[in-house]
Amino acid sequence: MNKYYWIACGIAASSLLAAGTQAQNPVTQKPVKQKAPYLNRSLPLDARVQDLISRMTLAEKVDQMVNNTDAIPRLQIPAYDWWSEALHGVARSGVATIFPEPIGMAATFDDSLVNRVGTAISDEARAMYNAAIREDSHERFGGLTFWTPNINIFRDPRWGRGQETYGEDPFLTAHMGVALVKGLQGDDPHYLKVAACAKHYAVHSGPEKLRHVFNAEVSPKDLWETYLPAFHALVSDAKVEAVMCAYNRTNDEACCANTYLLQDVLRNQWGFKGHIVTDCDALEDIYKGHQLAPDKVHAAALALQRGVNLNCGDTYFALIDAVKQGLVTEKQIDSSLAVLLRTRFKLGMFDPSADNPYNQIPVSVINSPEHRELARTVAQKSLVLLKNDGALPLRNDLKKYFVTGPNASSVDVLLGNYYGVNGQLVTILEGLASHIKPGSQMGYKQGILLDRGNISPIDWTTGEAKSSDATIVVMGISGLLEGEEGESIASPTAGDRLDYNIPQNQVDFLRKIKEGNPHPVIAVITGGSPMNLAEVQKLADAVLLVWYPGEEGGNAVADVLFGKVSPSGKLPVTFPQSLDQLPAFTDYAMKGRTYRYMDAEPLYPFGFGLSYTTFAYSRLKVSGGALHADASSASGTVPHARGAQASGTVLRVGQSLAVEATVTNTGRYKSDEVVQLYLTHKGSSLVVPLFSLKGFHRISLAPGQSKVVHFTLTPQQLSLVNEEGLNVQPSDTITISVGDAVPTPRSLALGASLPVQTTISVQ
């Protein structure tokens, strides 16, 4: 039961006794007579909404359909701004807990942890809102409608906003997105804690500079296999309250006026009942950028007819003229507004304050010790160890440590984008300094600038590094170089990274430190996207990818480097060796992209990440209907890596499949492990992925401990998507692989565990 329920019940009882026929409006704190049906909570929701709409003028209705709505004093409706952000913590609204950027959350492969993050964020959001309403404050970014999560597919490492996503895989993205939305929206049967929003619907991932004019051309197969599954999951499984349409066109129709995406798929096929909101000024793009309408009036009419309920921007004010010109009717506006107002009713904005348990959440939850500890845990589990030649974990009692690099003392590399603020930010330098023992020394110099050569030719850094027992170089990129159009002030390409390399001055600096240095050099890499780390991989004794790790990032990095916690993050994106391995940035076809369709050998493969311990996989068993196979012995190569194999078993079309495997910690350290299940289809006439992630579990194992991990594969998960975009389950052969990375030779060469595998036939 909701933890605030019993508090609310007591307050509600006393409030009702005191109020009699009047209720205290939670937003205005002014008496409102209960005789108005829209204020009568006992009436059906739709009846209340219709009653409220019936009391509005056309101008008032239209005003309620833009993000920054005016108050309607005669109805005691306050001003409200629909635009709030909470990508990895409440953003742009003051003090809040700052969790790792979503790409880092994805690296945890832990959807239950992400659900806890969503719960913490929405608790803080409600507490902030409650405090603001008491002060009669209705500022932007202070509401309860949050335009998050970003569940676009990170199909190309050049996209600057890929850091906001859960990576390149639709299965992982769906699970992480569903978990966050459920945490955000809460579990009360009557009220939403906050309203989440799935964005950017539906085929949107750069280039940033072209997003207001670009047409993403995508086949039915790629649309339904890659770009739509996460949105479908959030609508059907998480009951997400809102969907945001994107700036660009998809297959020649503007996403915010797209008959197929908004009506045929979202409303009719999926049965979406929530509201559709535009990205900010996307309706302006319809007549300016895409030139699909002659003017603002026609663009507003087109969007309304296609199902858009809320306009972030001012284009919808033209709906008044659209009615006058006969382009739309007031009845159409009423129908669209009704969908939108349902959200405000579900948030409790027209009910007595005491009726809603979420109104009792106190401000003490904001950046509380519990939330900071959660931020630290998420950051710990997000860090990905890419290389370790025995340099890690470090002892914390060496005589002298040296920390250097452009990002060691940077706050920006903790934050990513869409962030809040607080006084608890722990830089990587601060985290490292707090972990060494008294008597040890730690020196620090930034050494170099982020992305250009030093102005002064004098070098006082590399010599000090070489005289230290261990050097930690904190390098990579930051939000200055990648992000949303307009946010990345050092980016020459609107936040995208058209140069895949890390800044050359950083590579030269690392090389100079390593040359002739007998002591370990550890590279700590910050950033939100894949980058060319080939030289770093060669030069450094250990490489730790830390993403944008949030306010506790410094402590989490130190926890891992000094061995308090074993690294356990896994890559949610493929790191190509170079951009030459990829199609053009503007090509939205999946051929040659991501681990599922890229046949070139990457620098780092999807799902990869090392640990301080080692794991052994064994005893793979599959069963379904009459099928039972035990593939417990290691033999053969199926299809790209050695492992356990069994052949000749048969699964009937339409049956589910149970899979289990045993995982053993064969090393010296306690550690988490992310157990991953991949499918490879053979023998089908369809174009199929090389591999498809269909299951993952995060487990914790002490040295010598074993656990049996269970998966269930549904007929849907065993099916394929054909060229028409339809799910089919053909007769073919499926290889099932269970391990800790995508099962390729490159994964094994980098140190991944040997997977166990079996092959079944589907008939």
Where are the regions a protein language model picked out?
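Short beta-strand elements
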Residues: R746-Q763
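Bacterial Sec-dependent N-terminal signal peptides
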Residues: M1-Q29
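Glycoside hydrolase catalytic-domain context in secreted enzymes
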Residues: A18-A629, V638, T649-S719, Q729-V742
